[in-house]
């Protein structure tokens, strides 16, 4: 964890913050780190009594400084009651789907309500979890240039390719900036790439599924595509950094490195050779596609040191095993 300069930053102490969608993959880690730093946390969830949120109650400091609240983000009054009295808000809740009906209204109107409630509560800062999908989805974005926070996805291109997730996230982030400006809210945005690492929650998150499919034999080949990855703890830490650093502003791409899917399975095979990992690409005619080059300099300048991608992959598999989502081969059990 980077060293904090207390003259230019805030810290937990007597601060109360709200985390929306607290039971999610990134949000669970964020709640964990916030509690460790002494914050009092109000987490919004669909159902506080749902067993899938039970892991939050077991976090260190949760008994004393964590409360879970049933909130419908499409109901402004619902979120107002939780945000009132908070010093800051972390808006991480968002649907992950390619269904436009399920994506657009929750992503856009939910975000709008959170920012309006934050303005009324006069919170110090709102940190919004966006996505790399709001940055690079543009046919004119070259894989030969370094893509930084000034890039935006093209909405028409997202529509034409029916990438409703990127469309919804882009509309949501753009509207977040507009609403924040209208209401004079200090908004900072984190744009993570594909997030890997240990699961705190009992359920599998969307970003881990392709790793699981490589390991359990569901995927017989790998596609000719690249993916950029980052460790979940680094994403949570990025949220903390941009909240606590007074000078933080704008967008922050959160990315460690990019790998071709072939490189992913090669790394997995090195660490976990017992699994039936694919060895062939589904496209053997064309050369391997080049990855996008994303800049992570803004977060590095704040002091974030990224976890190497090999560690991300290793931690992900170990977590899938520990949570019972991936059987441990007998050979590995014997050597454990």
Swiss-Prot record:
Annotated EC: 1.2.1.44, 1.2.1.-
Q: Per its record, what are the GO molecular function terms? A: cinnamoyl-CoA reductase activity; oxidoreductase activity, acting on the CH-OH group of donors, NAD or NADP as acceptor
Entry PTM: The formation of a reversible disulfide bond reduces activity by perturbing the positioning of nearby catalytic residues.
Pathway listed for it is:
Aromatic compound metabolism; phenylpropanoid biosynthesis
Q: Name one Pfam family in it.
A: Epimerase
Q: Which residues bind NADP(+)?
A: 21-27, 46, 52, 72-73, 92-94, 165, 169, 192-195, 207
Q: Which UniProt keywords apply?
A: Cytoplasm, Disulfide bond, NADP, Oxidoreductase
Q: Which reaction does it catalyse?
A: (E)-coniferaldehyde + NADP(+) + CoA = (E)-feruloyl-CoA + NADPH + H(+); (E)-4-coumaraldehyde + NADP(+) + CoA = (E)-4-coumaroyl-CoA + NADPH + H(+); (E)-sinapaldehyde + NADP(+) + CoA = (E)-sinapoyl-CoA + NADPH + H(+); (E)-cinnamaldehyde + NADP(+) + CoA = (E)-cinnamoyl-CoA + NADPH + H(+)
Matches recorded under InterPro entries: Epimerase_deHydtase (IPR001509), NAD(P)-bd_dom_sf (IPR036291), NAD(P)_dehydrat-like (IPR050425)
One BP annotation, GO: lignin biosynthetic process
Question: What does the entry list under GO cellular component?
Answer: cytoplasm
Location comes to: Cytoplasm
Protein name as annotated: Cinnamoyl-CoA reductase 2
The species is Medicago truncatula
Lineage of the species this protein comes from? Eukaryota, Viridiplantae, Streptophyta, Embryophyta, Tracheophyta
Gene symbol here is CCR2
